[in-house]
Structure formats: C-alpha cells, structure tokens
Amino acid sequence: MPVSDALPEDLSEVLRHLEACYPQEGCGVLLRAGPWGPWRVRCLPNAYDRYHAADPRRFPHSARTAFLFEPREWLALNREADARNEQIACVFHSHIDGVAVLSAEDRQAAAPGGIPLLPEVSYLVVNVERGQAHEARIYWWREGEFQDRGVPL
C-alpha cells in the first residue's frame, strides 16, 4: 500500500486512548486491509518506562516524553495483521503539553540515517494538553523527507 496522508474520518478511538494515557505519551497503530479497506485502531501500551528503569543510559527519557512499543507486542501485532490481511498504515502517538510535531527523536527513530524503517507507514502526532487532544499532524515519507499536514480534530 503506498504511503499517504490518508486517515479514517473518525479518530475518536485514537483520541480517547491518547487522552486516557495522559500524562504519559500514548501510542498505537492504524491498520488497513488495502488502500480502500476499513480502518482498525490498535492501541498499544507505552513500554518506555520499563526500558528506562532497566537501562537509563540507553533509554534516558520517561514515558511522559517518549514512547516505545514492547517488541513482543509489535511482533504479535504484525502477525495478527498478516493473518487478517492488513497492513500497518499509520503509527500514532501523543506529545504531552507541547506541540504536534514529529520531533527530531521521532524522525531519527522512524528514519535513521535518512532511511525510513517503515517506508509505507505514516505517523500521526497528537498534542494532548491537560488530558485533552488539541492539535494533530500527520507525517509521511516522500522524496527523501517527511511531508506533513494538519489534521482536524
């Protein structure tokens, strides 16, 4: 499925999850069976604090300022998507009391060395202030860089 800025019309499940995770970053993925198939939201736990506790040098932040998928959850999600003939279309996460911008760390994680790890996947960032979603932007890789646009909430 070619990467695009497509999103489901109804983001309420995504927004509820991200608001419920406040004051930590929430995260998850949007899956889709082909470019015209139905969307499915899969909320995932933010495992960052567990990794920070085990290795604060390698994981210097907290779940308030960073997110990390649990590798076993990510593997299970990919197997589940394959079994359902779905593709991961979008990774979403929140920024807490800030702005809905794909940060330098987000960009580095998504495209280390300028090469996207998931070239067919877009990234939705939602700013959650005091437990309420306020702003969202979607990012996708095209022609060697991230493109973006605002997303109405």
Question: Which positions does each model-derived feature cover?
Answer:
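Conserved beta-strand-loop surface patch within small alpha/beta domains used
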Residues: 1-88, 97-153
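Residue-level "edge-of-site" marker
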Residues: 94
